[in-house]
Amino acid sequence: MDVIDAVKDGKIAKDAKIIDYYNADIYATVLPGRISGTTLAYSDIKYYEMNDAGELAVLILNNYTGDLVEYGLLTEVKGSSYKYILGEDEVSYNSGDVRYTVSEGAAYFAVANGQITKIGNISAKVSLKTVANGTGYAENGKAYAIDDNARVYIRVDGEYKAFELKDLEKQNYSTMTGYYDKDPAYGGKIRIITAY
Protein backbone atom coordinates (compact mmCIF):
# COMPACT_ATOMS: atom_id res chain seq x y z
CA MET A 1 0.00 0.00 0.00
CA ASP A 2 1.17 3.52 -0.81
CA VAL A 3 1.98 5.85 2.11
CA ILE A 4 -0.60 8.43 1.01
CA ASP A 5 -3.34 5.78 0.82
CA ALA A 6 -2.25 4.35 4.19
CA VAL A 7 -2.69 7.72 5.91
CA LYS A 8 -5.98 8.47 4.15
CA ASP A 9 -7.34 5.00 5.02
CA GLY A 10 -6.02 5.13 8.60
CA LYS A 11 -3.65 2.18 8.11
CA ILE A 12 -1.11 3.32 10.65
CA ALA A 13 0.78 0.88 12.88
CA LYS A 14 -0.03 1.08 16.61
CA ASP A 15 3.63 1.77 17.39
CA ALA A 16 4.16 4.17 14.46
CA LYS A 17 6.69 6.95 14.92
CA ILE A 18 5.46 10.18 13.34
CA ILE A 19 7.30 13.49 13.49
CA ASP A 20 6.35 16.82 11.97
CA TYR A 21 9.45 18.83 11.04
CA TYR A 22 9.66 22.60 10.50
CA ASN A 23 13.42 23.04 10.93
CA ALA A 24 16.26 21.72 13.11
CA ASP A 25 14.93 23.67 16.10
CA ILE A 26 11.19 23.21 15.56
CA TYR A 27 9.73 19.69 15.35
CA ALA A 28 7.33 17.51 17.33
CA THR A 29 5.91 14.03 17.67
CA VAL A 30 2.48 13.62 16.07
CA LEU A 31 -0.23 11.25 17.29
CA PRO A 32 -1.66 9.02 14.54
CA GLY A 33 -5.17 10.40 15.05
CA ARG A 34 -3.97 13.87 14.04
CA ILE A 35 -3.24 12.78 10.45
CA SER A 36 -5.37 9.65 9.99
CA GLY A 37 -7.94 10.22 7.24
CA THR A 38 -6.22 13.31 5.85
CA THR A 39 -4.87 13.67 2.32
CA LEU A 40 -1.09 13.95 2.10
CA ALA A 41 0.90 15.01 -0.94
CA TYR A 42 4.42 13.70 -1.54
CA SER A 43 5.71 17.23 -0.89
CA ASP A 44 4.35 16.87 2.68
CA ILE A 45 6.65 13.89 3.32
CA LYS A 46 10.35 14.00 4.12
CA TYR A 47 10.74 10.27 4.87
CA TYR A 48 8.58 7.22 5.51
CA GLU A 49 8.71 3.46 6.11
CA MET A 50 5.93 0.91 5.73
CA ASN A 51 5.82 -2.35 7.72
CA ASP A 52 5.20 -5.84 6.30
CA ALA A 53 1.47 -5.51 6.98
CA GLY A 54 1.26 -2.50 4.66
CA GLU A 55 0.86 -0.08 7.55
CA LEU A 56 2.69 3.18 8.02
CA ALA A 57 5.52 2.56 10.51
CA VAL A 58 7.70 5.69 10.33
CA LEU A 59 6.80 9.11 8.93
CA ILE A 60 8.63 12.42 8.95
CA LEU A 61 6.34 15.18 7.75
CA ASN A 62 7.38 18.45 6.14
CA ASN A 63 5.55 20.95 8.38
CA TYR A 64 2.25 19.28 7.55
CA THR A 65 0.10 19.70 10.65
CA GLY A 66 0.53 23.44 11.13
CA ASP A 67 0.90 22.72 14.85
CA LEU A 68 4.58 23.73 15.03
CA VAL A 69 4.08 27.47 14.84
CA GLU A 70 2.18 29.91 17.02
CA TYR A 71 -0.78 31.91 15.80
CA GLY A 72 -1.73 35.46 16.59
CA LEU A 73 -2.76 38.85 15.29
CA LEU A 74 -0.42 41.43 13.77
CA THR A 75 -1.77 44.81 14.85
CA GLU A 76 0.92 47.03 13.31
CA VAL A 77 3.62 46.59 10.65
CA LYS A 78 6.17 49.36 10.01
CA GLY A 79 9.35 48.25 8.22
CA SER A 80 11.11 45.84 10.57
CA SER A 81 8.94 46.86 13.56
CA TYR A 82 5.86 44.84 14.43
CA LYS A 83 3.17 44.85 17.08
CA TYR A 84 1.28 41.64 17.68
CA ILE A 85 -0.92 39.76 20.13
CA LEU A 86 -0.08 36.11 20.87
CA GLY A 87 -1.23 35.85 24.45
CA GLU A 88 -3.28 38.47 26.22
CA ASP A 89 -1.06 41.49 25.69
CA GLU A 90 0.13 43.39 22.64
CA VAL A 91 3.90 43.04 22.21
CA SER A 92 6.39 45.05 20.14
CA TYR A 93 9.09 43.28 18.13
CA ASN A 94 11.90 44.54 15.91
CA SER A 95 13.38 42.04 13.46
CA GLY A 96 16.52 44.11 12.80
CA ASP A 97 17.90 43.55 9.31
CA VAL A 98 15.26 40.90 8.51
CA ARG A 99 11.99 42.14 7.05
CA TYR A 100 8.96 39.93 6.72
CA THR A 101 6.52 40.53 3.87
CA VAL A 102 3.40 40.68 6.02
CA SER A 103 0.45 42.94 6.69
CA GLU A 104 -1.79 43.55 9.68
CA GLY A 105 -4.15 40.69 10.46
CA ALA A 106 -4.04 36.96 11.18
CA ALA A 107 -0.50 35.57 11.22
CA TYR A 108 1.72 32.67 12.20
CA PHE A 109 4.96 33.00 14.13
CA ALA A 110 7.76 30.41 13.99
CA VAL A 111 9.48 30.52 17.38
CA ALA A 112 12.72 28.68 18.17
CA ASN A 113 14.45 28.93 21.53
CA GLY A 114 12.19 31.82 22.50
CA GLN A 115 13.07 33.86 19.40
CA ILE A 116 10.83 34.62 16.41
CA THR A 117 12.44 33.17 13.27
CA LYS A 118 9.63 33.81 10.78
CA ILE A 119 6.32 35.65 10.50
CA GLY A 120 3.73 35.04 7.80
CA ASN A 121 0.11 35.97 7.16
CA ILE A 122 -2.77 33.50 7.07
CA SER A 123 -4.99 34.37 4.15
CA ALA A 124 -7.44 31.43 4.10
CA LYS A 125 -10.56 32.54 5.92
CA VAL A 126 -14.24 31.82 6.31
CA SER A 127 -17.14 33.92 7.57
CA LEU A 128 -18.67 32.08 10.53
CA LYS A 129 -22.33 32.13 11.47
CA THR A 130 -22.00 30.23 14.74
CA VAL A 131 -19.37 28.63 16.95
CA ALA A 132 -20.28 25.63 19.11
CA ASN A 133 -18.50 22.64 20.64
CA GLY A 134 -15.13 23.48 19.11
CA THR A 135 -16.55 23.81 15.60
CA GLY A 136 -17.18 26.86 13.45
CA TYR A 137 -20.13 26.81 11.06
CA ALA A 138 -20.20 28.87 7.87
CA GLU A 139 -23.37 30.40 6.38
CA ASN A 140 -23.68 27.40 4.03
CA GLY A 141 -23.57 24.99 6.99
CA LYS A 142 -20.05 23.71 6.30
CA ALA A 143 -18.28 22.78 9.52
CA TYR A 144 -14.69 23.76 10.30
CA ALA A 145 -12.75 22.17 13.15
CA ILE A 146 -11.33 24.74 15.54
CA ASP A 147 -7.91 24.00 17.00
CA ASP A 148 -7.88 23.41 20.77
CA ASN A 149 -5.41 26.29 21.11
CA ALA A 150 -7.15 28.66 18.69
CA ARG A 151 -6.67 32.34 19.40
CA VAL A 152 -9.81 34.46 19.73
CA TYR A 153 -9.71 38.23 19.30
CA ILE A 154 -12.79 40.38 19.85
CA ARG A 155 -12.79 44.05 18.93
CA VAL A 156 -13.62 46.16 21.98
CA ASP A 157 -13.62 49.97 21.77
CA GLY A 158 -11.78 49.85 18.42
CA GLU A 159 -9.00 47.50 19.56
CA TYR A 160 -8.69 43.73 19.44
CA LYS A 161 -8.46 42.00 22.81
CA ALA A 162 -7.66 38.34 23.48
CA PHE A 163 -10.55 36.17 24.68
CA GLU A 164 -11.24 32.45 24.99
CA LEU A 165 -13.26 30.29 22.62
CA LYS A 166 -15.95 29.81 25.26
CA ASP A 167 -16.62 33.57 25.08
CA LEU A 168 -17.66 33.14 21.44
CA GLU A 169 -19.76 30.09 22.25
CA LYS A 170 -21.67 32.07 24.88
CA GLN A 171 -22.42 34.96 22.53
CA ASN A 172 -22.18 34.72 18.76
CA TYR A 173 -21.11 38.04 17.28
CA SER A 174 -22.58 39.54 14.10
CA THR A 175 -19.21 39.32 12.35
CA MET A 176 -16.94 36.35 13.06
CA THR A 177 -14.08 35.34 10.77
CA GLY A 178 -12.16 32.10 11.13
CA TYR A 179 -8.63 31.91 9.71
CA TYR A 180 -7.34 28.44 8.88
CA ASP A 181 -3.86 27.28 7.94
CA LYS A 182 -5.00 24.99 5.11
CA ASP A 183 -8.04 23.13 3.80
CA PRO A 184 -9.57 20.85 6.46
CA ALA A 185 -9.28 17.85 4.08
CA TYR A 186 -5.51 18.22 4.45
CA GLY A 187 -5.57 18.45 8.24
CA GLY A 188 -6.16 22.19 8.47
CA LYS A 189 -8.00 23.78 11.38
CA ILE A 190 -9.21 27.22 12.31
CA ARG A 191 -6.31 28.78 14.23
CA ILE A 192 -7.59 32.33 14.76
CA ILE A 193 -11.05 33.86 15.09
CA THR A 194 -11.74 37.58 15.00
CA ALA A 195 -15.10 38.97 16.00
CA TYR A 196 -16.97 42.21 16.58
What are these regions (language model features)?
Residues 1-196:
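...the same signal can extend to comparable exposed beta-sheet modules
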